[in-house]
């Protein structure tokens, strides 16, 4: 669900920012999100979790996260330019730059410390690099918008961003707690993953002047 929303967001970017260069990047990112969708589907199949995926609505932490991420993507449908700028900011910082990265870290740690999931780790490493690029492009876009329209980035915008950041962390924290519900990992403690997410969130905020 979220990958579909992400693909649509980048594919629609040109309609709100009709610059050929932005359109080219948006369409390229949308295509890569199709590959991400296929890669994640393959991972579910390899892990034998396809049946579990159908039960996602029965897992509060995952349902809440899907609802949160979907809501963030829906903000892009706004007609107001200021609100659209906010949607680009939230989307780039909290979906592309933070969401999924705790899971990337956990799976790759099994390969690093236990020599497990090597094939999956290679796919995730490639995917995470692309997600990072998407987030960085969005951050550059937000900073350009801020230079051109500084009046949009007022106290109300700051409050919206900080509120969204807190919601993002709360959502990620619940997913991490769910992943670790059967116990901690000696090679990657739960608190380390939570601090990793906080670090990415803080870096994301600083990158756009917050």
Predicted regions located by residue number:
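Non-heme di-metal
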Residues: 1-210
